[in-house]
Amino acid sequence: MTHHPSAASLRLHGARLLFPPVATLLFLLLTEYIARGALSGDTLVQYIFPHAEAYLLAWGLLFLVWMAVDWLTRFAPLATLLSALLGCLPATVDFYILQLRGEPFLPWDLMQVSEAAGVASAAGIHVQKSMVVSGVVVLALTVGSFFLYRGRQKLPWVQRLAGFAASTAATCALIFGVFLQPAVTQSLGILPDAWM
């Protein structure tokens, strides 16, 4: 006798399959919302659509990070929170740096985070509505992922390590094979001055 899954279990499985790509896509939009301070149709047309390849790659990075953390820990809320932070924290720093000096966040700015926080405070720059809204959305998705993935089947360590290794390898390939290769990023239309 074969076991046929119920409609409810199929819906739950479908929701669990759709959650990571949809949540990480939403995190990508929140990242843009935070960095620009607003998200409108004009933002989509002027900044996102012309650089669709770059945004697709950024979404892929957030998705792969979600998958790697989930495979390793089997704790979806942690995967959700970390992938959201990976996008939203640099966007927050970028927003403040644009406010302070008129140019985007650059990797070496990480060395000056504490100094920048003091300058931002002295300059009267405050938490923006986009950051609060994004925080609420991230919190809701993190809590929602707890309930969505609660009670899911435990996997043996071998499967978990294999999934983690595959996700991590794909993440590294994306970082080292695309993002850190100027010729590749240039061929995809990802230019340093395109984000100003």
Regions found by a protein language model. Give the residues of each.
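Short, basic, low-complexity termini and linkers enriched in Ser/Thr/Gly/Pro
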Residues: 1-11
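Transmembrane and membrane-interface helices of multi-pass
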Residues: 9-195
